[in-house]
């Protein structure tokens, strides 16, 4: 199987829509592909946060938590892009991430 470029995976994530039946497995597969085959960097953040903006109430049956855990497992400074995303459209998981980030920052001081 040919490994795809990061921008191809991100484009598919950006265009993802769950099936009419509410099947999110396609996004789950895309996120797995992104985390396992590429070096996630700052360029990925806007696309990943746009998923939260498009689905602000997280109806993904837990799939979008993969974005939360994946980003939090990196050493990326994601606070600014997260705040920008929340300014465009507040989202449940975006707010959770910001709260967790602020809590972690406060405890690290």
Q: Predicted regions: what is each one?
A:
Residues 8-19, 30-33:
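Solvent-exposed, amphipathic alpha-helical segments
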Residues 25-39, 62-73, 95-107:
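Structural detector for internal amphipathic alpha-helices that build alpha-solenoid repeat scaffolds
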Residues 17, 52-56, 71, 86, ...:
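Alpha-solenoid helical repeat architecture
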Residues 2-13, 40-53, 76-86, 107-109:
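Amphipathic alpha-helical scaffolding segments comprising HEAT/armadillo-like alpha-solenoid repeats
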Residues 43, 62, 77, 92-93:
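Structural detector for tandem alpha-solenoid helical repeats, activating at a conserved register
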